[in-house]
Amino acid sequence: MLTIYAPFNNKNSKAWEVFNGVEKSWPDQITKLDNAVETDPVSNSMFWGFVGNNREMVKKLEARNHNYWFTDTPYFGRFDNSNLKPDNHYWRVCKNAIHVPYLKDCKADRFEKFGMKIKAPNFAGKYILVCPSSTGIHNYLDKPNWTNEIIEQIKRYTDRPIKLRHKPRGKGTSGPSEAKVPLSEDLKEAWCVVTSCSIAAVEAMCEGIPVFCDHKSFAVDVGNVELSDIENPYYGGPEPWLYSLAYQQFTPEEIQNGTAVEILMDKEIL
């Protein structure tokens, strides 16, 4: 049995792109409950983002060591509200975590669809670019004061300027479409990016910029976690990691037609 905690009070939520497809393709029997009402989740649950009571329920499942699935925005191929099609945007699918793990030996094919170029690092940047995640993520990490605390920690190890880039928000949504200044612009002279779990880590790595992140970040396998290394950051070739990310995010069409289930089974996630 898979129990989906869904936003019954918002029939226009993009969560339904995931859940309607899961209902058609998932190998388990499905039941749906209201994420704005339920507070005591059962094992083998599925969530979309930290809406309703999702964050509190995910924390309870983790404390009990119970299985759950978490779906949310992708690492690349994010939706465009002005051009929504079932095959032109993606959702990440994670098991027992809010971000995906690093899967070795994934093929390049799914990543190559995005035509993203990867630059070699030149370590010529000037400032530290701090990219906080959302308040909801920081509360999930039990680090509600992450931004102020991380800036104070950075100052212990470097006298480089610090540039703060908050998650863009507006028009009832968040992400690149609402940014007044593109992330690519802020990365041009960045020495490194410091984030908790922001997807900004993907663009930074593709631009050849080292990343510092939280232990629960999807970038932990290619990034740095100790700020004491900020003047001597590690940067490794991100290609295999990017291939892994691409194999753990799916279009609404792929979720509905069984492609997502097939890949998750092949990778022994499902």
Enumerate the predicted regions with their spans:
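Donor nucleotide-activated moiety binding/catalytic core segment of transferases
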Residues: 33-39, 155, 163-211, 217
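Short, well-ordered secondary-structure micro-motifs within conserved domains or adaptor modules
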Residues: 34-63, 69-72, 190-196
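Short, solvent-exposed loop/turn segments at secondary-structure junctions
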Residues: 9-11, 51-53, 74-77, 133-137, ...
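N-terminal pre-catalytic "stem/leader" segment of glycosyltransferase-like enzymes
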Residues: 1-50, 55, 136-137, 261-270
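A short, gly/pro- and small-residue-rich
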Residues: 52-80, 148-149, 206-220
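Leloir-type glycosyltransferase catalytic cores
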Residues: 81-125, 221-270
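A short, charged/proline- and glycine-enriched loop
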Residues: 1-4, 121-134
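Catalytic donor nucleotide-activated moiety binding site of glycosyltransferases and closely related
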Residues: 6-10, 131-132, 136, 145-183
